[in-house]
Amino acid sequence: MKRENNLVLSLLFFVIVFLMQVGEAQNRITNVNVGIVNDIGTAYSNMTLLCINMSLSDFYSSHPETQTRLVTTVVDSKNDVVTAAAAALDLITNKEVKAILGPWTSMQAQFMIEMGQKSQVPIVTYSATSPSLASIRSQYFFRATYDDSSQVHAIKEIIKLFGWREVAPVYVDDTFGEGIMPRLTDVLQEINVRIPYRTVISPNATDDEISVELLRMMTLPTRVFVVHLVELLASRFFAKATEIGLMKQGYVWILTNTITDVLSIMNETEIETMQGVLGVKTYVPRSKELENFRSRWTKRFPISDLNVYGLWAYDATTALALAIEEAGTSNLTFVKMDAKRNVSELQGLGVSQYGPKLLQTLSRVRFQGLAGDFQFINGELQPSVFEIVNVNGQGGRTIGFWMKEYGLFKNVDQKPASKTTFSSWQDRLRPIIWPGDTTSVPKGWEIPTNGKRLQIGVPVNNTFQQFVKATRDPITNSTIFSGFSIDYFEAVIQAIPYDISYDFIPFQDGGYDALVYQVYLGKYDAVVADTTISSNRSMYVDFSLPYTPSGVGLVVPVKDSVRRSSTIFLMPLTLALWLISLLSFFIIGLVVWVLEHRVNPDFDGPGQYQLSTIFWFSFSIMVFAPRERVLSFWARVVVIIWYFLVLVLTQSYTASLASLLTTQHLHPTVTNINSLLAKGESVGYQSSFILGRLRDSGFSEASLVSYGSPEHCDALLSKGQAEGGVSAVLMEVPYVRIFLGQYCNKYKMVQTPFKVDGLGFVFPIGSPLVADISRAILKVEESNKANQLENAWFKPIDESCPDPLTNPDPNPSVSFRQLGFDSFWVLFLVAAIVCTMALLKFVYQFLKENPNQRNLRVLWEKFNEPDQKSYIKDVTKCQCSSGQGMPKNGQEGANAVNNGN
């Protein structure tokens, strides 16, 4: 019993001690005044105020050891800029608050930030998102939310992914709406996306004023819109857009997070008007703390919806409580101006001595909040991820995410390894339902529905009418256009998967540069003609892909390089070959005579006769079989070799001479443009583009001559420089095809001195038609249609002229080459070797038969005597040469040989 009494006394003692410590701790807690400026009465403000109260309650219940307590004073700004400023002034002057949470809008925040800077009172906003607030450069301004401009990169990636080339922003006409525009414009320029116009909606716009803006948007070609409006104005805007017909198939609407973050609290009617739109939404990562908070919120406030602004208000309050606790309780005073001085309340604004220290602690605060990682960097929260949503059904459906390091991706926990330039949108986002309840990706623009047809300028005066030809209809008095360019453009229009209405407008007030400039001035929507693509023109217009081959050709006359005279028969062989051949005739005849002289009567007789026989025998081989018979073995070998050599030589000579007499050896009179420039010769041109290139190359004005038609060009080239014509002309390769198709036997293209991109269709800079037209050109080129048009319009007038593109040199320049000794030296060498061997054999045999004779005269006499030891010594002279013949038959010849032996 005694033990039990002691235990009770001990417990009672500890309880008394604990209560005394708690009382002392409560006495040590310091209250710190904090102001809240909000538009009381709106759904958003009520939600954020509840979140602020829950944040303070949660913080101090989980941190009972803190020495400070935030005491809040709520002031209604009544959705008015002046009232908000007055509220802040009252809080600073009369309540001496050490920080202010709020205000709600960016316009209200501007003046409050200035007051906070002057009084050293931090302004912590959880809903003012305009980027323009950062330009105030106040170190006492903290944005516990995301800057609107932080989402423009996500918007850019969406536009880039689908390849849209024009975007029209829609924004409210105030600080909030205008703040995002500079950064949005910059990022769109990075991907060459134009902003052709902007739709600015007044904050107080009536439904009729909104309808007027929507009707204007409907008449313009751009179909991609980025909407940056506050929630109430956005609801009215999309209601009218649905009513007018701007939410049907073909339109693209991209919402900023100002709207998508509050989709959860919009009613069904408002959501129904936004079906199919895309949006960038603030990403809130899942966490146990967030789920617990949502559960408590639903139980306590079942009729109030929670969104990200409430979470930011909760986190901002927690951050402020942490910062004040760290800053301590020293210097919680204001230094005010002397009350005796006659100054206004603003001029007499006090300065908080607590502000600098609170500024430092706020800048260091970092924790995991309900909305994600909370840390001020340069006074702002920095987003790492945005959510991409597609409004479908009852709300926004997540279709992907955006992160700075990875771009767009489907799942937040499955990031791609890197940004893939050529990936399709299906690889980056989940399926999308577009306006009009379609899954087909809108092309982003279309011909406006205001009945306007494309006005296409076409030149009337054209040098090469195969491209564009204008004729006057005598019945309707209208201009009818035809030609390759016209037919090709119509084929391209048919290849585009949508209808384009257009009218051809004749242009006859200038050249092609003037016509192209009309597109820049807005008089024409396009130009269809044989317009050369050049860098100078591309500075103020856009070109489609070229629909013809590229390049500029140098066309010059050709002439026959061979002079046909009475001595042309000597040209096939070089002088050396002629001399060697003549010498060879004599040598071969001499060798055969030496070998046959002692055994063959046909090579015997008077000296004059024998000399003529030498030449006669060797030369007659070229025409017919010689009458003299060759009897000795070595003579026959020599003759056979000579026969072959003469055959090859005569056949080659005949072929070469025939080529000289029958083939035109055409050579260009000029080989390159540099030779024209060096000699100062005249050059013809047709277009202003080529004129400019010639001037840039150094040609003088006096040497440049314009031609107006293919016939005129032919006349100038035919005259030549000496007779007032030109030595060469420069023309684009497509024109060369036409010109040489008519005059291929007189001229040829020898060089392409200038590189150009060919001929293309002209459009205004940034026209969305350019991409579709270019894609359609590729389709036409890949089909058989392009070849059909070329065959129809570029058929050569002279049917003997081939296509200069597929056969650029129908009359190739043949450089005549005379036959020289180098082509036959092997044959002459063989003949020389055989002759030498035969002579050596003969001399050896002759000296062997006369071993003791050294007297040349005696040897000559022996040489002139018939060889009595030869088996053919009794052969008589051939009747064809002297009336005597060989033995009548073979038996007599054999007997004669036997008798001789």
Curated annotation (Swiss-Prot):
SMART domains: PBPe. The keyword Acyltransferase does not apply. It comes from the Eukaryota. Expressed predominantly in roots. First strongly detected in all cell types of the root except at the apex. Later expressed at the root-shoot junction. May form heteromers. It is found in: Membrane. Glutamate-gated receptor that probably acts as a non-selective cation channel. May be involved in light-signal transduction and calcium homeostasis via the regulation of calcium influx into cells. GO terms for biological process: calcium ion transport; calcium-mediated signaling; cellular response to amino acid stimulus. Residues 26-574, 651-823 are extracellular. Residues 596-604, 626-629, 845-901 are cytoplasmic. The keyword S-adenosyl-L-methionine does not apply. It comes from Arabidopsis thaliana (Mouse-ear cress). Gene3D superfamilies: 1.10.287.70, 3.40.50.2300, Periplasmic binding protein-like II (3.40.190.10). Belongs to the glutamate-gated ion channel (TC 1.A.10.1) family. This is Glutamate receptor 2.1. The chain crosses the membrane at residues 575-595, 605-625, 630-650, 824-844. GO terms for molecular function: calcium channel activity; glutamate receptor activity; ligand-gated monoatomic ion channel activity. It is a multi-pass membrane protein. Glycans are attached at N46, N53, N204, N267, N331, N342, N461, N477, N536. Keywords: Glycoprotein, Ion channel, Ion transport, Ligand-gated ion channel, Membrane, Receptor, Signal, Transmembrane, Transmembrane helix, Transport. Pfam families: ANF_receptor, Lig_chan, SBP_bac_3. One of its GO terms (cellular component) is plasma membrane. Residues 1-25 form the signal peptide.
